[in-house]
Amino acid sequence: MKKVKKKRSEARRHRDSTSQHASSNSTSQQPSPESTPQQPSPESTPQQPSPESTPQHSSLETTSRQPAFQALPAPEIRRSSCCLLSPDANVKAAPQSRKAGPLIRAGPHSCSCATCPCSSACWRRLGLCHSRIFDVLLPRDWQMAPGRGLPNLLTFYRKSSRKPSSHRNACPPSPRNCGCGSGGSRSCLLHH
């Protein structure tokens, strides 16, 4: 009992000395090494850990919330990377369209529907002459485009040396009969 009372009185003395020491060093509010042994006192321990514990809990809560927030952006990043892949595909498609930028301006050609690319995209049905369409759509370096055979431009710009009866004929029935000479519907300018 006496030891407990002595410890309490010593703790009070230390508190008084530290309060005087703290008032004298008001500019430096850092606790001195003498104040560190005071922390085990029963009155000071509930005061100090309670303010410290609440920020720690809030910091723990914020850190526990931060991984939750970080977990949410991670899928968004993946989604954006997926989205980045699609713009890359668009970017890959863009240079092809840029290659298609400079267009050939050919002279006026008479339309002969026998050379119309296919029945599904018959420009005559659309009310447009296919030779005019290809004057606008066919790029200069289309022959150099990878994956496409070298088309014979005469298939596109064939003069109307045929009889006018050929105009009465319908376009070829299927894309396989495409007049572009590339051999397949996927390599056709209108069927890619």
Swiss-Prot record:
Pfam families: SPATA3
Keyword Nucleotidyltransferase set for record: no
Compositional bias per record (Low complexity), positions renumbered to this chain: 19-59
Ranges of compositional bias, category Basic residues: 1-15
GO cellular component: sperm flagellum
Keyword Transcription regulation: no
Keywords: Cell projection, Cilium, Flagellum
Region (Disordered): 1-65, 161-184
InterPro entries: SPATA3
Location within or outside the cell: Cell projection, Cilium, Flagellum
UniProt main location, coarse: other
Name by which UniProt lists this protein: Spermatogenesis-associated protein 3
Gene from which this protein is expressed: SPATA3
